[in-house]
Amino acid sequence: MKFIILQIKLLLFFLICFSFIVKAEEPKKITNDHEFNFYSGTFDFSDDGKRSTIIGFQHQNESLVRDSFLGVLSPVTGAMITADNATYMYTGVQAQYDLGKVKFTPSFTPGIYNEGDGKDLGHLVEFKSELQLSFDLFENSQLGMSYNHISNASLGEKNPGANSYMFNFLKQF
């Protein structure tokens, strides 16, 4: 038990220190109001029976970016569809950590899921947690990879969840 408490304290310490480092950076001037993320990959890659191709689109409004002790936060909205016609529409929050040419963007987005002919995730309401790493290609373009987990947080009688990975192309307009 003491070991778990120590781990939690260390995690909180590093999160707070990291947020001050990010906060200390000079804020970048926003020249483009919108960032679009086009992605494709494999939905539920860890389940051989329900694995499927996925494509999606996400929008981030750069004019709504806010600094916080957790870093730079912004709202995101998007949708995805699998080859089995499962769909997920979501909106939530994304943190942005600028590490030079590399961007790290974790996000949390509640949404509405329809299984179509795909995997039954157990509930209409699902929650997506995602980690994304992207690299600057050009001034307004990035290429990245992301991993996410979609789960209903035990709202339904069953909660199988789905793990997915995607390749991302991000463009600011």
Outline where the language-model segments fall.
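Cleavable N-terminal export/targeting peptides
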Residues: 1-31
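Solvent-exposed loop/turn segments connecting transmembrane beta-strands
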Residues: 43-53, 79-90, 117-124, 154-162
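Helix-adjacent hinge/juxtasegments
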Residues: 84-108
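Mid-chain, well-packed structural core segment of small domains
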Residues: 103-129
